[in-house]
Amino acid sequence: MTREQLSLTVLARAGFVGLSSVRAELEELATLTGFPVDDLLPALLAAADPDTALRLALRLLRRAPDQAAWFLRSWKDARRLLRVIGASEGAAEFFLRQPVELASLHRPVTALPTAAELREDLLDAVGAVGGFASVAEEEAWTALRVRYRRRLVQLASFDLEQDDPVAGFDGVAAALSDLAGAALDASLAVARRQASGSGPGRFPEAEVRATRFAIIGMGKAGARELNYVSDVDVIYVTDGAEDAGVPPGRAVDIATRLAVLTQRGIQDPALEPGLWEVDSNLRPEGRDGALVRTLDSHLAYYDRWAKGWEFQALLKARSLAGDWELGERYVTALAPRVWSSASRENFVESVQRMRERVTDNIPDGDLHYQLKLGPGGLRDVEFTVQLLQLVHGQTDGLVRQRDTLSALAALAGQSYIGREEAAAFSHDYRTLRLLEHRLQLRHLRRTHLMPRDEVEVRILARATGLAASAGQLLTQWNEIKHRVRGLHERLFYRPLLSAVAAMPNEDARLSGEAGLTSEQAQARLAAIGFRDPRGALAHIAALTAGVSRRATIQRHLLPVMLQWFSAGADPDYGLLSFRRLSDDLGGTHWYLRMLRDSSGAAERLTRVLSGSRFVAELLGRIPESVAWLESEEELRPRAPELLREETAAILARHESAETAAAALRAVRRREVLRLAFSGILGFSTIEELARGLSAVTENLLTGVLGAIRAARDDAAALEFAIIGMGRFGGRELGFGSDADIMYVFRPLAAGQDAAHRAATAIVADLNRLTEDSALPVDLDIGLRPEGKNGPSVRSLDSYRAYYARWSLAWEAQALLRARGVAGDSALIGDFETLADEVRYPASIGEQAVREVKRIKARIENERLPQGADPARHLKLGRGSLSDVEWFVQLVQLQHAAAHPALRTPSTLDALAVAAGEGFVSGEDAARLRAAWVFASRARSAMTLWTNKTADVLPFDRVVLDGVARLLEYPPGAASRMEEDYLAVTRRARAVFEREFYGPPQRPATTA
């Protein structure tokens, strides 16, 4: 082909990028080798990066013309060399340093070497005889590293020539691992020579020879899964030889010296660069532990101190170099400990958290380029497989495999995962590993990041043979990531179904899997967090038995639902509640459709059922409400005007107060359940929930009162109203909160006594018709004048007379949150006007302020339940609700007359105004607000979790963890939540004591 015929188009089609210089370089290569350009182009076309192959070939010819020209004398030899250096600049750099090693590619590599062949070859490189090298230190290191790299480029040549490198990946990885083991053995032989003799750091040769020293391969080295450039994880073990005069302590000293020198031979700087890092940090105690231990010391550590992840790391351990028999003893002795580790408490959770931490620690800029650690990467496959192995390997020795691919095959063979899933996982894993291999081969550098440069991605596509262009490769990679992530997220759970699915035909088993035994299924359930695996298995059996449409859909859905249940605080109760719900709704078309088609609804259902007994019990009474879980809009609090419209419609439909009240109680149950859903699933803040719960209670009272008044037909005789007090008046109700109220009436046509009797009858009807055993309503009138000693209902004039003559400071303070919630609007307006005169005095004397502080101190002393820890009481404790509310109310009593914005029944609104007006600093207000919100959330969370009201932060860790989960803490964070609460309230208490009591005036308190 002439220069004119060598067009840029031809060069581009051949894969060249730097077209401006390629033509001249091709002509130079043709001149130096004697090959016509027509022969060189196909040879370069076989290279992943033709530009680099051409450039490096010219460098080799210039650097070592004789060796390179000799090697490039045939087209086949040239093609083989160009393919290697076109895929690996690192290999070319090796040839430039050691031109004579070009001869290593003189013949095609048609088969992978055995471990024995590699070990013999590398020991020969250092002249090893009887385990001792005959070559001196620097010379030995160079000889070892050159021989290693000779073998490495031969392996690369074999790898690059494969027709199907995906299928051949595991053979190449095994050979690379064997090569690493051989290098360690050769370096150990050099180390023995260096450690023998007299002087510092040396020992008598006889003692060195007698010291038993084994190098245990961990991770990919142990599993024979190494990359071209991997850190090689190792653990060192020794044993004394008393008969040879080497006691254990002496053996540890000698072996430690051997370990240090062996590592140097592999990784320290020298004429020929180091090979890779030898990483011994998986040893007992990590970096802080002894580099070398005796076998007995290892066993003692793993028996007493080792954590769960350390046993997972040992899963791949094998004897890699040194004393083979000692290494096998180490592996054999630790195997029972490895395969029983999954039975440790919280083992699975700790491993899962470790996996999450790995992802969390990836820099944001690298996350989407990570082949290994990111979502859908290699670690997702390896993590899933290892977790399945550790769980099922407790009872099944066949799954105790070191390498990922063999383990996948064994798990499928034993029916712990489906064969199709195993095949998909296996193929995707091989593909990801091939990408990793080719990336590392490029520069013989350790990396797990996909290139960001399009040219580099195109080179990777050519090197792997997976795609013709960069875009195609990235598309394929993203598909693999999505597929791997999906399998990772569900694979661990799916096989549970086959243990209980009563399918008459074995061929109809789920995903083609054979069944697990009951014991195996129970072990899996226990491993993922079920406390009663036998009971859980019974529920699964009931849900999936038979051939009905419901059973079929639930068989398909339950695997992932079990995963979601296990992520909840109480998976057992969640599964039980799901079974009950399915028994109620399983025959309805919409329920089955929702389960099948709406993964969002199914996941939300598992979250609320496993996270709240309150919700589960209430949902059992309103099962149709599960339909809300499909729609975010249905999970938000309903607007008050919509509730009022529904209430008006109910009152219009029902002639009887009893039937109307029953319908209104059902509305309340329904809306409280909606709010519980909303809070647990994160659709509402604590303030929104408080307003919503207050509106629902207000709506119930409005409706029931309207039904009672209509039935009595006494509107002309008297006016009647309900005044909300406390948290109800402030629109601050939580789940399980009492509704503090007062009743007021005003005679119209009736006389005072008759009106009072009528009002008393209305109150009795209200108490009777709002009573609900399914969701109790506690109408508390304890804040009325004279407290428990006062009448349950008063006329407006009676209130006016009382407040004018007898009102105590606490009663005026209680009125700060008084708000009309139901009844005649004119009466409500007049009552609130009266309340304003009492609660917003033009001035408040020092005596009254002291009285407020005295009462608060008395409450701290007397109202706390006996034995209650004041630091943990959410309502009356230090820095909790009471402190914040009393502080705000004192500010209102002192300043609301002059500052109308303070005239609000809402604690948080008043606190914000107080900060804005300068009555409290912004920082102090923020601390008070944080404590009030935390305590309010915790009170509601305790009701949701236990279905009981409580005011004391529990000590029970199970309950505390359930509460913490509802407060959006991660699993196992009970102590963290507890510490956060105590810290928040401690800061709030400091503000309260300083700003409310003031150091000189603060009364003594024993609380």
From Swiss-Prot:
EC no. given is: 2.7.7.89, 2.7.7.42
Q: Where is this region: Adenylyl transferase?
A: 505-1007
Catalytic activity line of the entry: [glutamine synthetase]-O(4)-(5'-adenylyl)-L-tyrosine + phosphate = [glutamine synthetase]-L-tyrosine + ADP; [glutamine synthetase]-L-tyrosine + ATP = [glutamine synthetase]-O(4)-(5'-adenylyl)-L-tyrosine + diphosphate
The reply to whether Nucleotide-binding figures as a keyword in the UniProt entry is: yes
**Which Gene Ontology molecular-function terms are recorded?**
[glutamate-ammonia-ligase] adenylyltransferase activity; [glutamine synthetase]-adenylyl-L-tyrosine phosphorylase activity; ATP binding; magnesium ion binding
Q: Which Gene3D superfamilies match?
A: Beta Polymerase, domain 2, Nucleotidyltransferases domain 2
Q: Name any cofactors this protein relies on.
A: Mg(2+)
- Has the keyword Magnesium been applied to this entry? yes
Membership in a protein family: Belongs to the GlnE family.
Q: What's this protein's function?
A: Involved in the regulation of glutamine synthetase GlnA, a key enzyme in the process to assimilate ammonia. When cellular nitrogen levels are high, the C-terminal adenylyl transferase (AT) inactivates GlnA by covalent transfer of an adenylyl group from ATP to specific tyrosine residue of GlnA, thus reducing its activity. Conversely, when nitrogen levels are low, the N-terminal adenylyl removase (AR) activates GlnA by removing the adenylyl group by phosphorolysis, increasing its activity.
**Name used for this protein in its record:** Bifunctional glutamine synthetase adenylyltransferase/adenylyl-removing enzyme
Q: Which organism is it from?
A: Leifsonia xyli subsp. xyli (strain CTCB07)
